[in-house]
Amino acid sequence: MDKNEIILMLKNVSTSPGVYLWKDAKQNVLYVGKAKNLRKRMLQYFDGAINSYKTNKLVSLIYDFDVYICKTNKEALLLEKAMIDRYNPEFNILLLDDRKYPYLKVQLLKDSLLINLSRKVNAKDSKNTFYYGPFPSGYGAKPILKLLQHETLYENGLLIKNKDYNFWINQFNKIKEILSFKNNNYINELTNKMHQAANNMQFELALFLRDGLTYLKKLKESQIIELSQYKNIDVFAYKTDEKLIFATVLFYRYGILINKVNLTIPLGLSVDESLRVFFEQFYEDKILPDNLIVQEELLNFDLNLSSEYKFISPKIGTNKKVLDLAILNLNDYYEKEHLVIKNQLDKASNMLDSLNKYLNLPKLKNIVVFDNSNINNINPVGVAIVYTNGIKNKSLYRKFNLEALNERSADVEYIKQSISKFFSSNKNTKDYDLVIADGGIQQVNEAKKTLKTLNINIPVIGLVKNEFHKTKALIDLDMNEIHINDLELYNYLVQIQVEVDRFAKSHFRNRQKISSLEGKLRNIKGLGPNMEQNLLNHFKSYAKIYDASVEELSKIVPLNIAKSIKNKDYE
């Protein structure tokens, strides 16, 4: 269809909310979008209302479209996400930042409290669940977690038991008061406890309390009293470059600046569309704040977000001061990073061009790399890592537990298992442009055979290591072993091989830990199913139980059992 035919058809599209798919002449999905009014939004692509350097390219490729009408904006959001996951379209953006920040999670139970750290936030949790965060990674969260556990779950060093529900409601509210600093005497009380412990020569306890105090005081010092009545306020500032959006987010909790995040967002079809996708992805695993303080120009965008987003753009007062602070931090981040990040993106693009000189493929957007790890064929694992536009795409990384084999060719068979598992659970196979097998000709052959069995047509190459386990050469599409003379490309391929090896070994170590504990913990005298479940509820996995210290374990189980776990008395 030509442009005029498409516009004519669009005039008959529903004005309901929904999801639209732009397609090219081969019916490949180019872009997936969401709209409150499908007809209005889709026509904007052809009247110049959506203006960026990428829009013209997209419009030139559009040959057809599909629409899915939805009852609500929320239903459209879920469908859009599913469609993007399914088709991985060329013009949809993916956040470069994949960090997940820990929240302190407090749950009120009938006969206790459950206090832990969680990187997942469930907005549907009941009023008996309280989140506080997000904390900066590796900073502050654990000392405060341990302090709150000590202050609310223990008395005189012993776990509190046999208390009624009202007692635990009070402990639950006590934590809220501590973290909001509504109880101004608490820090003084804690300081007195620390001095008393030191006077009683309980130096370990005194140091423990001192660590918790240090972090609480840092939080208190950053509190803005005028904002203290608000549980959650986030401040968002941004500026655009040619291909990128740079952003700074400040997180205020009860007026306390608890975290700052700097981000680089790929600029998609337009600034408003890119920001809309950013907000939906960014707050997918975070608490949506009571208010989002933003620059005035952001209010003029049609972001097509749910009514749960409360944007305000202050001109005076305390809110304007924190917005100015976010802009100040943003400018500092931009000056330091914009050239560095732009160079990284350009370099990744250049590396793909250099690699493609050896392959001559139509495009190299998504590359998937396979590797496995095992020792003597015990607990073998496989992994797949994905590079999108030359950059690690950790949201698409996958790991697999493989079936152990004893024959000499097991290493080759493990590649087969990994590829089968990856593509059997992956509907958008046609969106992968290249498979890289970590290995030589045997591994590449096995990868090709496996893909053929699965009726998947994707080119395969290999990365060969030498006897010192260093990258040696590339197995090209014609099964030739080629030594890479381009030093930059060689180093780039080395980085890919190091990354897939790291991911495989990390998964293997975790599987070893799990196999060491799973099904064996109850071999320890006095450790029954309830105690095992309590450990799993707290630590979330056998691997984390394996890594826990005696001190951490003894907060959940008796000290003698904690020592038995650490001494591996279950073996």
Curated annotation (Swiss-Prot):
Keywords: Cytoplasm, DNA damage, DNA excision, DNA repair, Excision nuclease, SOS response. GO terms for cellular component: cytoplasm; excinuclease repair complex. One of its GO terms (molecular function) is DNA binding. The keyword Ribosomal protein does not apply. InterPro entries: GIY-YIG_endonuc, GIY-YIG_endonuc_sf, GIY-YIG_UvrC_Cho, RuvA_2-like, UVR_dom, UVR_dom_sf, UvrABC_protein_C, UvrC. It is found in: Cytoplasm. GO terms for biological process: nucleotide-excision repair; SOS response. Residues 15-93 form the GIY-YIG domain. Residues 184-219 form the UVR domain. CDD domains: GIY-YIG_UvrC_Cho (cd10434). PROSITE patterns: GIY_YIG (PS50164), UVR (PS50151), UVRC (PS50165). Belongs to the UvrC family. Interacts with UvrB in an incision complex. The UvrABC repair system catalyzes the recognition and processing of DNA lesions. UvrC both incises the 5' and 3' sides of the lesion. The N-terminal half is responsible for the 3' incision and the C-terminal half is responsible for the 5' incision. This is UvrABC system protein C. It comes from Mycoplasmopsis bovis (strain ATCC 25523 / DSM 22781 / NCTC 10131 / PG45) (Mycoplasma bovis).
